[in-house]
């Protein structure tokens, strides 16, 4: 049986992981050394892909984008875009294009990242998943994986309960999908734990860094 593994690094950006930038929740900087180990040359990935939130400053997922008085973070609103209406949770401003918070942390060894998938760049439409945005438009990730002949997808990054989860739930339809437990962090401990349960319920494997299937990437 063929085995063609890809590493997908989800949204490891300063606004999500670095305590200097992060405005709410817990720092997730601890996942970076784990991801760096996965990026060492003895791991024979067929490709390494990073997703990246890249929002305009007036993105409609931001609390400040709906009235002169910002709505509280966590408020759910209906957004109309291109003939679709979707529900959107509002967040504090984050990962605004051309700001330091949008960039990968300096401590991330990005030399092996072959492709970067930007998402959320349309001010009207959020995109948690690396595969599709909130109204089902294609972000281009699947085309890259299929062109590379990928069979197995290993996912790291943040947040376990949001963008990691949505990316994994899409990936499972086409690839053997694995969440590397030490390499993901949630927006809270409770939401992280619930996401791990949701992965297992969806038949997505949650593995450790030492799992034989991950170690086999070194032997491809």
From Swiss-Prot:
GO cellular component entries: cytosol; nucleus; peroxisome
What function does the entry list? Catalyzes the deamidation of nicotinamide, an early step in the NAD(+) salvage pathway.
Catalyses which reaction(s): nicotinamide + H2O = nicotinate + NH4(+)
Family affiliation: Belongs to the isochorismatase family.
Q: Which keywords are on file for this protein?
A: Cytoplasm, Hydrolase, Metal-binding, Nucleus, Peroxisome, Pyridine nucleotide biosynthesis, Zinc
Q: Where does Zn(2+) bind?
A: 53, 55, 94
Compartments, as annotated in UniProt = Cytoplasm; Nucleus; Peroxisome
| Active site (record annotation) | 11, 119, 163
Q: Which gene encodes it?
A: pnc1
Molecular-function GO term, any one: metal ion binding
PANTHER family (UniProt xref): LD05707P (PTHR11080:SF2), PYRAZINAMIDASE/NICOTINAMIDASE (PTHR11080)
**EC number(s) in its UniProt entry?**
3.5.1.19
Pfam families on file = Isochorismatase
**Protein name, entry field:** Nicotinamidase
Question: Pathway it acts in?
Answer: Cofactor biosynthesis; nicotinate biosynthesis; nicotinate from nicotinamide: step 1/1
